[in-house]
Amino acid sequence: MTGQRGRMTGVLSRDVRDDVVRLDGGWRLWRVAALRSAGLPFGVVQELAVPALLDQPAGSDRDRAIRAARTAQFDRLIRNEVLREALAWQNPALADSWPRHYADRLAAGGEPHLANRAYREVVLARYAQRYCARNESIGFFGAVAWARLVDADCGLRYSGAGGVRRRTSFLETWAAAAVAQALERTPGVFDLLPVRLHAACSVAGGMVREPRRPPVRYSGLAGAVLTAVDGVRTVGAVLAHAAAATGDDADEDRAELLRLRDRGVLRIGFRVPHHERPELLLRGQIERLPDPSVRDGLLAALDGVAAAATAAADARGAAAVTTALGEVSRSLVAAGCTAESTGRRASHGRTPVYLDCRRDVDVTLGADLIDGLATPLGVLLDSARWLAAEVADAVEAELRRSWRWLLTRRDEVTLADLQFAAGDVLATGGQAVREVQEDLQLRWSEIISAGATAPLHLRGDRVRAMADALFPSPGPLRWAASRQHSPDLLLGRTADGATCWVLGELHVAMNTLESRLFRTQCDDPAELVESTARDMSRGRVVPVYPRHAAGATARTSPPTALDPPGRYRYWSYDADDGRAEGAVSVPATAVTVHEVDGRLIGRAEGHGWSAPVLEFFGEFLSAVTVNLFTLRPRAPHLYRVLIDDLVICRESWSFPAGEVPVPVRPGGDAGYQRLRDWGRAAGMPRHVFVRTPGERKPYYVDFAAPLLLANLARAVRRAAEADPQAVIDVVEMLPSPDQLWLTDAAGHRYTSEFRMVAVDALEPAEVVTTVGVPTAESQVAQ
């Protein structure tokens, strides 16, 4: 920004759009937003609280009463069939062990004994707080709903019964891949399998280029085999073409083909990319096999797996889910999958199928609600844009250093070379990116007084004037994906109808609705794709993630699932299985890196295009940047901060684990009185969320609920044993329980949040530039 509201430098979009609403500073919000929520009513976990009992005088009588209350609460949770059904989907091995046995004995009217009771009470309470207090987007315990932002002043309106409108089960990609590998081992199938070049390898000028290896000149026999590979021909067809070209013995051609496979240059077999229906992609490949005696048997085995996976969506109740998942496992065995290929995943809680659901809720958010976000959210997004630009500068400086170092050791540097040399930077950003985050917090400290001794309520117009100076416009955006950011916004509503927005997280340089789960559960997926196409009007360069890439799954991003047809370019850095729709991907070894006017450019000349290296690495940049948006560094106590009617920072506390007064042993303090006194002395409210080292997500704690305090004590105790200085973070629950607005037909309340997409008015200067003329050789083995 130049210091005057609305004035920007850089490349401004000229697109006139009706699919967005406008915010301050040129920012826009998609009109469609996802509603994420808890799957079980908040009242289920509220019933764990016994405030009146805890207020009684300490002593043995109170301790006995608390233990009796815990037993009754545990029994009530075990009897909750919906909770145990959620547990069966998430952790079937656990659900089918002591929870099932205990529930069966309760149902029979007995008073069952439970070994290791205190620990197991905490385990069940931990699952309960997740299903009741954490906003999710998975299964029926995190069913996806949708909201629409409209121009009318209608406040908050919603319709629907609040339950599940649609349930769909999907086969995991890894399970489909295990089936493919099993079918490939069927006698008589090998010569019918397709052969393709390793996605990151390239063949040009008589040389084979592989990642992390020097180029190798191939022999006449290898050349004949490689020339015959076009990504479609089968083993038998490749061998026939090679034999016709060389006149060599068939056994020699086969040996060379296998040698190239074992070296990693070639891949033989079915492609199973990440997709919501990987079994259908596999089926299409099997249907192309020419021999019906082989083809029909493979299809029958695959169809058995697909049918079992589809039927799992109809399972209701923990026992039925366990049975359905067992049927899927049996179908995998029947298809030839080994225990080694599937058991390891199952032992880590990865079921071969997953469930995604559409919640029976439709929300309308009126302009009178969104208008209150215009200035505060616009300021936050300005600082997110600044953050992304600074990260880009820091990462490119590191990439340039690596590129120059590589250039002293070879004649040309490929994208594969640079990615390997700068792997640490692309994975974490390194110290330079940490310094950018610190700079962000220092700049925000000019707006938010670090020494505040009470909650801050700031006026948006004053904050805007400061933000214009603190977060100036960086000029053209540095990579395409940084045009989109995803704020998670919670809405609180009091009994008298007053509302207040709360910022949960702001995901920088990432559209979190690109996850496949949102596309499959959207009523109109084309709307999401069309909005993406307009946001990415200049194109985008996207890596094709291998199946084993960290974080890559069929249901979440990466890989992206809102690709506008023909708009993106793709490149491959590992042995991926391609894009499901068959888009051509450029090998990383076929992209050479050059410095032009101080910027690194990747040229895929054999494919006819080039792009800035930051664009090639854009998805990695987004992964580095997405969670950096933290406005304040940790401190023992930080007060709540609002800009106009948006809470941008909730009240929070941080402590070394060794200073939290947890009992030395489980059950050593039935009422956890010292923990409650500690929280009260620190000024904490009754309802908080806590994050401890080793836990991926924060968890809910009610200081009036002994079972939830036991869960807190266990987590803190483990953290302190590992490192007494490990930091425990506590944040107020906001909206508070009495401000939850989402209800079902029975009036039960649920936690919820809106996942929105914000779009910058600025765009990249350029993404893809046409260079050269694609060569025939460059198309080999795509």
Placement of each model-derived feature along the sequence:
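Type-3 copper protein
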Residues: 1-164, 251-540, 742-782
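Acidic, low-complexity/disordered tracts enriched in E/D and polar residues
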Residues: 124-228
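Acidic, Ser/Thr/Pro-enriched low-complexity segments and adjacent helix/loop capping patches
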Residues: 165-199, 216, 706-710, 714-718, ...
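Hydrophobic residues embedded in beta-strands of well-ordered beta-sheets
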Residues: 207-208, 273, 599-602
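Short amphipathic beta-strand/extended segments with alternating polar/hydrophobic composition
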Residues: 209-220, 408-418, 609-618
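Catalytic cores of large soluble enzymes that bind and process phosphate-bearing ligands
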Residues: 217, 230, 387, 391
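Short capping segments at the starts of secondary-structure elements
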Residues: 227-237, 241, 247
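C-terminal structured domains
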Residues: 493-725, 732-733, 744, 749-775
